[in-house]
Amino acid sequence: MKQLFTQHIKRLQQVVQTILETNFLSGLWIHSGTARYHFLDDQTAPFKINPHFNYLFPFPTAENCWLFLDGKNKPTVYFYAPNDYWHTPPVAPTDAFFADEFQWVILQDSQEIAKFIQNPTACTFIGEDENLAESLGFNQINPQKVLNQFHFERSIKSEFEIEAIYQAQFAALKGHQAAKQAFFEGKSEFEINLAYLKASQQSDLNVPYGNIVAINQHSAILHYTQLDYAPNPQQQSFLIDAGATIHGYASDITRTYAADPNSEFAAMIKQMEQYKYRIIDQLTVGVNYLSYHTQMQQWIAEMLYEYDFVRLTPEQIFEEGISRAFLPHGLGHLLGLQVHDAAGFQQNPRGTRKSPPEVYPSLRCTRDLAENMVLTIEPGFYFIDMLLNPLQNSPLARHINWQKIAEFKQFGGIRTEDNIVMRSQGAENLTQKAEIELQLSDH
């Protein structure tokens, strides 16, 4: 990772230099952030690092630390390492693979930073605590023009970032295997989640997002995180959407299982997986992501016809918008330091935004695919009452096999998700690559 990070930070030094020159600035100060206190409480929420800090300094537990960059000299990290007997004192990672790329200053008192900030009016501040920035004399605080430039750069990953996301696949896949086993042993959602955390060596505090561990109808809730503590004696299906992080970079993987491998629902899961691999094989640099989402909607229309849920032609099902009730979310999203990573709608460094079309409001990416973009591909098929009820009260209702839909509501839904990186010749499936290395893939 050391060599890859050296290339990564060299590229970012050039990016920072361009940002400073185009915005007539002499330097960039980035604050990593601090844990927020709960309202009227002395307890804090878990610390979540400023992603722009993590972008340059891959150490996601670096709380209340600072970076200074001028685009020319070696960046300086001001690492906050107070003496403390209430909490485990932070230890500066001065022997980490990335350490040699920085000048180091250790702060034992957070107020010490003030003496290092020279001429703040000629610099910009990036961070959450705008009151802190004002108190230190900054007047250019999170300028949108600077953020736009950073966000656009973050959408095209360096080889260091791609490797981190690839490494994050392994912990997640080990967790998925343990969760699958726990489901087939009849465990509760709560117990399945514990199995995932143990196998992936994570806690609920450092997973990249709340694990979705959904049995039966719970799979129809797209972001179900409640967890039943008691086992369900009538387990029919299981959907798990869970990831891991390496150096702050996330994996985001989803799998669905049928309790009865010979059921029609199991066949539907297999077909959805085939659709996922088929669309991944089609991904091409320069083609807009919307076209692939539209293709998936057309395939969902075919499934609705083939499995006799809707008694219209696939073309009619798609044109009438019926498929959108069964796949209400987008095909996927950019992935990186944030699970839904920056600049999914941003078309250029200036910040030009292209919103999703009205018929697909949940689409999270409207970009043309570019080399070294990392994205999720996550088609789904669900039985969601909130979306089916309007159809039941529409003229299209007579074409829909409500009896069969009622029978399948017990399964909740299907989602299958892999993480891919765009290469010049097409998509490289990072999840499948890790599955093969772990000897988990049968594709």
Swiss-Prot record:
Give the required cofactors: Mn(2+)
What EC identifiers does the entry list?
A: 3.4.13.9
Q: Name one GO cellular component term.
A: cytosol
BP-aspect Gene Ontology terms: proteolysis
Enumerate the InterPro entries for this protein. Answer: Creatin/AminoP/Spt16_N, Creatinase/aminopeptidase-like, PepQ_N, Pept_M24, Peptidase_M24B_aminopep-P_CS, X-Pro_dipept-like, X_Pro_dipept
Q: Which PROSITE patterns match?
A: PROLINE_PEPTIDASE
- Positions that bind Mn(2+) 1: D252, H333, E378, E417
Tell me one GO molecular function of this protein: metalloexopeptidase activity
Name of the featured protein: Xaa-Pro dipeptidase
